[in-house]
Amino acid sequence: MTVLERLAATVEARKGVDPDSSWTAKLLARGPEKCAEKFGEEAVEAIIEAVRGDRDRLASEAADVLYHLIVMLAARDVTLAEVMAVLEAREGTSGIAEKAGRG
């Protein structure tokens, strides 16, 4: 099991838990919209660090982005396994061809 899979399992386990017991439970209790907002905030912070060129800060912000992405997915009952399946289906396909095939 990868660290992302363990993180996704932990996030899933926080659903329905007392919001005062964990940050993840609190985010999930606030609903998908709040989870999406937090994901967006963290993505912007990662972008800022990418522009600044601070590798350590970028790695830290990227970790926050991944965490908040998993929380946002969980808030809408989309599993990490589902996302990984989409990526696996796209593997080996040109990005241009894959994008054209969506239309």
UniProtKB/Swiss-Prot annotation:
Subcellular location, record wording: Cytoplasm
GO molecular function: ATP binding; phosphoribosyl-ATP diphosphatase activity
Enzyme Commission (EC) number: 3.6.1.31
Catalysed reactions, semicolon-separated: 1-(5-phospho-beta-D-ribosyl)-ATP + H2O = 1-(5-phospho-beta-D-ribosyl)-5'-AMP + diphosphate + H(+)
Cross-referenced Gene3D superfamilies: MazG-like
Record keywords, A-Z: Amino-acid biosynthesis, ATP-binding, Cytoplasm, Histidine biosynthesis, Hydrolase, Nucleotide-binding
Superkingdom of the organism of origin: Bacteria
GO process terms (BP): L-histidine biosynthetic process
Predominant localisation class: cytoplasm
Pathway: Amino-acid biosynthesis; L-histidine biosynthesis; L-histidine from 5-phospho-alpha-D-ribose 1-diphosphate: step 2/9
Pfam families recorded: PRA-PH
GO CC terms: cytoplasm
Transmembrane segments: none
Similarity comment: Belongs to the PRA-PH family.
Full protein name: Phosphoribosyl-ATP pyrophosphatase
Organism placement in taxonomy: Bacteria, Pseudomonadati, Pseudomonadota, Alphaproteobacteria, Rhodobacterales
Gene name, Swiss-Prot/TrEMBL: hisE
